[in-house]
Amino acid sequence: AAFIEYCGRIDGRIHLCGLSLGGILALNYTLDFPEKVKTLVLIGTPHKVPKIMFRIQNMIFRFLPESVFQNMAFNKRDTFLLGNSMKNLDFSDRVKDITCPALIICGKKDRANMKSARYLRQNMKNAKLKIIQNTGHVVNEENPQDLGRLLDKFYSGTGI
């Protein structure tokens, strides 16, 4: 709800970019408010959430100390609640409705999301897929230079 409220306060259309769970938020927002979204970038984002992944993730989160979450966008409790709220999401039948320009990015070694990246590219009308070499799921940490170049080209309209 806070994300929707925040985006709603912005005048005009917005550029959304999300990685992993953030990509799920961006995807969901784009589907619910297509008139507000100018462009969409999804990095390592699943189009449907594998329930087993969230079960394992939530088990791990329970045992992690609060200090692990200090540099994240959400504290431990909110991260856990966000994950639980997303565990039944499946955008398979809806992504075809996304018409804004979109860039799908996936690390070459991100086996968990490669199939989804290809699915999104095939089912979104104006999407392009870019694979970043020598990179797993955390593209922004593992290869920030290549990610930055892709984003710069996409947002500046100089071609992908």
Which residues make up each language-model segment?
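Conserved alpha/beta-hydrolase "nucleophile elbow" surrounding the catalytic nucleophile
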Residues: G18-G23
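Hydrophobic, aromatic-rich cap/lid helix
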Residues: E66-D93, K109
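Short beta-strand/loop motif that positions the catalytic acidic residue
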Residues: D97-I98, I104-C106
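Catalytic histidine neighborhood in serine/cysteine hydrolases
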Residues: A117, R121-V138
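Catalytic active-site module of serine/aspartate enzymes centered on a nucleophile-bearing elbow/loop
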Residues: N134-I160
